[in-house]
Each structure stands twice: as C-alpha cells, then as structure tokens.
Amino acid sequence: MRIEKGIGIKNVLKIMCPGTQLREGLENILRAKTGGLLVIGDDEEVMKLVDGGFYINSEYTPSYAYELAKMDGAIVITGDLKKIVCANAQLIPDSSIPTYETGTRHRTAHRVAKQTNNIVIAISQRRNIITMYKGDIKYVLRESSVILGKANQALQTLEKYVAVLERVINNLNLLEFQDLTTLFDVVTAIQRTEMVMRIVEEINMYILELGNEGRLISMQLNELVKHIERDGILLIRDYCKDGLQYNEVYEHIQKLNSSELLELDAVARTLGRGGIPLMDTLISPKGYRMLSKVPRIPSNVIDNLIKEFEELSNIIDADINDLDNVEGIGEARATAIKDGLKRIKEQVSLKKEI
C-alpha cells in the first residue's frame, strides 16, 4: 500500500470539491464579486473569537451563504456543514500570530485558522480567488478547467511511462524464465514502477480536486494502471534480501526523493543489495510474481511452494510428483501450476518476438 501523504489537505478538498453544497455556495459568492469569509466549525475556540453579527442557526444552503456574504462580516458554519450558526460576524484573532497575507480578510482568515486549526475560507473580492486555510496549510482552489488541463497532461505522461514499464517488465519476464536476470533488470523495473505510481498519486490529487467532474479521468487512470502496484510489490518480494520485510522495503522506496530514485544503486540498497555491480550480478526470483499469474492458486499455496523450492527456476524444473508433495497441492493443482507456467512462458516469448 502507498504511504498516505497530505491527508489533511485531502480531507479538506473532499468537502469543498465541485459537486458539494459548500463549493456551490463558494462559487455563487465568487461570481457575485462580493468577497466573503467563512469559518467551518462552531466550537468554543472559534466562538470566543466572534464579535457582533447575528445568530441565525438556520439550515445551510448555497443560496443562503450567497445572500449572507453580501454583508461584510464572516459566516460561521457548523463542522458538519448542515447549519449556518451566525453571519456578519467580526472575527478577532490574536494579532501577535504571524501572517504573510496582505488583505484584511485574508490576514484574519490566516490567523483564525492558525489559532483554532479550523478550516477558514477567504474569497477575494477583486482577484476572484478562493483561498482555504487550516492551521499552517494554505491552498488556493483552482477552476475545474485548469485542473482538467493539468490532469489530461499528467495522463499523457503516465501513458508514456506505462509503455516504457511494460517493455521493461516484458524483458524481465523473458529473463526470469531463462534464469538470466541481472540486478540491473530488477532494479530498473522497480524504479520504473515507482515512477508510474508517483504520477498516479499526482493524478489522484487532481481527481480529488475535480470532485464529480473527475469521473472520466478516474476511469482512464484505472484502465491504465490496473495491477501495476500489486505486481511492483510482488517484484520487491521476489528479489529483496532474505530477512527484510518486503512491505518495509516498499515504504523505503516510496521515501526516496526524486534524485535518489534516479540512482539505481540507491534502489538496490533498499533491496539489501547495495555495493555490488548491477550489470554483472545474476539474481534469481523467488517466484511470487509469476505464480500469482497462474489462475486459482491461493497465496498460502504459493508460500508453501516457495518455502519448498526457494526459487522460480526450481519450481519450473520440478515435475508433477515434486509439486504434488508440497502441502496444499494435489495432482490436479500440480498439473494446473505446471500448465499455467508453461502458458505464461509461451505468452512472454510471443511478446518478445513481436
């Protein structure tokens, strides 16, 4: 599984992406060019900063938010976004809290967000920009057309990266069946998989920002990546040094910065195989990835096979009786494994010829 990054901003974007009631209200205020200041949450920490205004305690609707924003003061909405607590309120945060904003509305929003750790939204009257603050986080909401353009560009980049990854994996598949895999081939495949997954993360952020307008992008993304992450994890499991936990290795790879990821030696070190020549070191897979492609073979049976034979080449060379002796494998399953691996080998050879 991927390490969750930017959980705070993701949770905020979910409640204010296109298609939500809150976003509709913000867009109405933006189009009216009245400007606005909204605080999400009516806890004690927020309410003690509120001065004046009038209490409404009415159901939240986008049209109510738009009408109330015509007044200069702030609008306070409950944390569940169901009620407008008060409107035309003056917010008086601690003036000693540092802020780099210039406009009065944005300075107030920034300070309130820092002091209460609540979501505060400032809508600029002149610049037509919606800015969200939460704690130290500042995020400017962009128009859907801008995000769509960036998402489509990222998808085109992803297509090219996936095509390169497929070529690398096809080459690796052939070498695995010939038992001629080098550390260079393995590390290149893992590096390329991680590059693809990082672009996927970026596109997922765009999808989150687009809300209900991101469905087509999401469908295209799912079609492109399919089982890439799963195969990448199995690749790590096949080649990481004995004694290392494959999920921890995967986490270390995710933590590599962009320049480290470009260094194949750095990727090799995460597998516990640093300091050895990449091109000249032959390395045999355990077989998790290839065996996972054989239909109807449970994971515990794959574990038993690898525990017994240790390497994929030994499993390929084993006859049906040898496979039958492994716990959880009868004659029928042994035949299925043998035939399945043979079929995969033929498919791999055909792809190479093409």
Curated annotation (Swiss-Prot):
Subunit record text: Homooctamer.
Any GO MF annotation of the entry: DNA binding
Protein role: Participates in a DNA-damage check-point that is active prior to asymmetric division when DNA is damaged. DisA forms globular foci that rapidly scan along the chromosomes during sporulation, searching for lesions. When a lesion is present, DisA pauses at the lesion site. This triggers a cellular response that culminates in a temporary block in sporulation initiation.
Matches recorded under InterPro entries: DisA, DisA_sf, DNA_integrity_DisA_N_sf, DNA_integrity_scan_DisA_link, DNA_integrity_scan_DisA_N, DNA_integrity_scanning_protein, RuvA_2-like
Family, similarity comment: Belongs to the DisA family.
Phylogenetic classification of the source organism: Bacteria, Bacillati, Bacillota, Clostridia, Eubacteriales
GO terms, biological process: DNA repair
Superkingdom of origin organism: Bacteria
The keyword Transferase is annotated on this UniProt entry: yes
Protein name per its UniProtKB record: DNA integrity scanning protein DisA
HAMAP family for the chain: DisA
Keywords: ATP-binding, DNA damage, DNA repair, DNA-binding, Magnesium, Nucleotide-binding, Nucleotidyltransferase, Transferase
Native organism: Clostridium beijerinckii (strain ATCC 51743 / NCIMB 8052) (Clostridium acetobutylicum)
One of the Pfam families matching this protein, by short name: DAC
Enzyme class label: transferase
Catalytic activity, EC: 2.7.7.85
Binding annotation for ATP: 73, 91, 104-108
Catalytic activity: 2 ATP = 3',3'-c-di-AMP + 2 diphosphate
Known cofactor(s): Mg(2+)
Domain (DAC): residue spans on this chain: 6-144
